Amino acid sequence: MKKLIFLIVLFIVVKTSPAQDKQQVEKACMNYIEGFYEGDTTKLIAAFKPTMYKIGYWKNKNTGAYDFDGQMTYRQALDYAKNVKEKKNFPKSDAPKKVEVLDVGNTIASAKVTAWWGIDYILLSKQNGKWLIEQVLWEGPPEK
């Protein structure tokens, strides 16, 4: 009986805590930023669900309006990162890399990322104990 109680308590303790979930969401978002900054597809693969998509808006210099800038799929994101690495098109060393976790539920989470290209709102889901990015909505460039 003592062993059964011990195992039940152990299972409850081993289950991820809200603080661990938040750290894992932050890590997925940092992998996202660093994957694009460094051209590291391994970090992007660790961050994304294969069905991920990213859509965004870029501020038109002439009109000041934010125009739709297109959609990026998982495959396109990996190709973009490869291109960054091949061309050594890395951002400046002081480029922003900020992650703010907005909310974490049992299986869903949201975060705000600030990077050189602008602001991203990210939706994640937890599957098999791992937090992965499902959707990204962004606008840029960031206001100075």
Predicted features and spans:
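Ligand-binding grooves and catalytic loops that recognize ribose/phosphate and carbohydrate rings
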Residues: 23, 49, 69-70, 139-144
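Short beta-strand edge/turn micro-motifs at domain boundaries
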Residues: 110, 119-143
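Hydrophobic pocket/interface hotspot
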Residues: 32, 44, 52, 111, ...
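Beta-strand-connecting loop/turn residues
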Residues: 50, 106-107, 129-130
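Short, low-complexity N-terminal intrinsically disordered segments enriched in polar/charged residues
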Residues: 16-42, 46
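Surface-exposed, charged secondary-structure patches
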Residues: 53, 57-58, 66-117
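Bacterial Sec-dependent N-terminal signal peptides
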Residues: 1-23
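Short, solvent-exposed secondary-structure junction/capping segments
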Residues: 30-34, 48-62
